[in-house]
Each structure stands twice: as structure tokens, then as C-alpha cells.
Amino acid sequence: MLILTRRVGETLMIGDLVTVTVLGVKGNQVRIGIDAPKDVAVHREEIYQRIQRGDEPVASGAHHNDDCSD
């Protein structure tokens, strides 16, 4: 596992097309933004596991808005 340190506002690249930006840190929560092509699915791990088990249908566009709550 690659471990990186980033500050709020800093970004890292995954390949040429995916960027991950640290948007904020509050207590033990880190808020990140992910910019990826529409054909790249992005999910929180627990959502991904539910999808793999067939517990949750994949909604169109859900890969860009898994958890937008504060």
C-alpha cells in the first residue's frame, strides 16, 4: 500500500485521468473529492460490497455522488 501525506487543497493523481483532492479535515474525518471519467465507478467500500452482493442496484450517476452529506 502506498501511503501519502496531503494537506487540504492538495491533490494526487491516479493514472492520467483520476484526481483525488483533500477538501477538508474535521476531527477524524477526511473529506475528499474525486474527479474521474464517467466510465470509472467510484464508491465507498461499504457501498461497493453491497453492490457486489447484489443488495443495491447501481443507479445511473451514483458513482459520482456516493456520499455528499456533511
UniProtKB/Swiss-Prot annotation:
Keywords tagged on the record: Activator, Cytoplasm, Repressor, RNA-binding, Translation regulation
GO terms of molecular function: mRNA 5'-UTR binding
Keyword Repressor appears in the UniProt entry: yes
Domain of life: Bacteria
Pfam families attached to this UniProt entry: CsrA (PF02599)
Compartments (UniProt record): Cytoplasm
Keyword Repeat: no
Cellular-component GO terms for this entry: cytosol
SUPFAM superfamilies given in the database record: CsrA-like
A single BP term in Gene Ontology: positive regulation of translational initiation
Chief location: cytoplasm
Cited HAMAP family: CsrA (MF_00167)
Assembly notes: Homodimer; the beta-strands of each monomer intercalate to form a hydrophobic core, while the alpha-helices form wings that extend away from the core.
Alphabetized PANTHER family for the sequence: CARBON STORAGE REGULATOR
Function: A key translational regulator that binds mRNA to regulate translation initiation and/or mRNA stability. Mediates global changes in gene expression, shifting from rapid growth to stress survival by linking envelope stress, the stringent response and the catabolite repression systems. Usually binds in the 5'-UTR; binding at or near the Shine-Dalgarno sequence prevents ribosome-binding, repressing translation, binding elsewhere in the 5'-UTR can activate translation and/or stabilize the mRNA. Its function is antagonized by small RNA(s).
Family membership: Belongs to the CsrA/RsmA family.
Name recorded for this polypeptide: Translational regulator CsrA
Species per Swiss-Prot/TrEMBL record: Xanthomonas campestris pv. campestris (strain ATCC 33913 / DSM 3586 / NCPPB 528 / LMG 568 / P 25)
Gene name tied to this protein: csrA
